[in-house]
Amino acid sequence: MSRRRFLSIGSKLAALSLAPALIRTASAQEGVSSKTVTIGCSSAMSGPLGGFGSAIKVGADAAIGQINAKGGVQGRQIELQMVDDGYVPQRTADNVRKMIDDGSVFALMSCMGTANNAAILPMVEASSLPYLAPFTGASSLRNTGTRNVFHVRASYTDETHRLVQKLLGMGIKDLAVVYLDNAFGKELLADATAAMAVKGVQPVAQAALATDGKNLSEVVAKIMAGKPAAVLLGTAGTASVGLIEALKKASPMMPLVGQSVTLSALDQKNLGAMGSGLALSMVFPDANRAKTPVVRDYQAAMRAIGKDEFSQGSLESYINTRVLAEALERAGRDLTRTKLRTALLSFDKFDLGGFNVDYSKAAPFVGSHYVDLGVLGANGRFIG
């Protein structure tokens, strides 16, 4: 046999032996089979913000159960691949990198945290992995250069400006700000000072709270020294609980206002009566009031999986999953990532039943600017 003939046969055999692996890789890269479509999520299931991650999981499970019970999307069942990152940005990046390298997910949904999302957005863009509903409202992560990221919730800037405007409109100008000592908190501080500056006001005191709350006493002392009329909380997770308790003890009647992520449902439960009177911004309807079809659907889905405690976090995750399912349905049976992006861009005031999502405008793609205000009662639920 000639050398040329030998090499020709050898190369063909090698190609044939590799073909099944290549076919598997091409298929796995999209996280799609004839029967399933797999969605990835990295979130804090443990650590100081573990309550938020648990809510994301429960809300997604409720929506997926409801959708799959009706036949799924285009004949496929939705599967969620959720991995704990403990709210550590490097772990988030490692988790998402593994999903991309393994080719195990078709799209990404609701990864949590400002610094965590900052760590993964470059690889999301580089890999062309569609990413729906980051669980953060940071404006720094919403820029015109992104083409694969579709936000659902309103921004922290939207929330902060609404809160500051409300306080100033009530004649309360001596505002103090406590912010978490990380990227999330520092951005909220910038939003708050910018919103106040518009009205010619600046904080009478500001202090950075460690994510584990270890400097709580110093923070409270610094804030109270400024003699504020109200305190704006740019904090999240268990650190918020200790802060609210300490501020309430220092000045029981002083108004405290926070954002949608200041407290998880578990945090609200742990606060109990100490949380009564706390004002919070809301970027989704009240999860405990079945006034809109989407909230009624959510509550039914939660009950179907044996959950009868409703929360803003699980409602947000439920809505995010419903948005993704609608996009998957619009993308058609012959599913590709490009078709999913095109489907999302077709959302023009899409009404989920009292909550609209719109991606018809230019990037950054932000589906909602809904912001409302609520006040907690002693039972941890919004009053009225």
Region roles according to the model:
Residues 304-314, 325-382:
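Segments of small-molecule ligand-sensing domains
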Residues 99, 104-112, 132-134, 176-179, ...:
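Periplasmic-binding protein-like
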Residues 58-80, 198-201:
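Signal peptide-proximal N-terminal region
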Residues 244-317, 382:
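Extracellular/periplasmic periplasmic-binding protein-like sensory domains
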Residues 30-32, 51-58, 73-140, 209-216, ...:
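Beta-alpha junction/loop-to-helix N-cap segments that form part of ligand/metal-binding clefts
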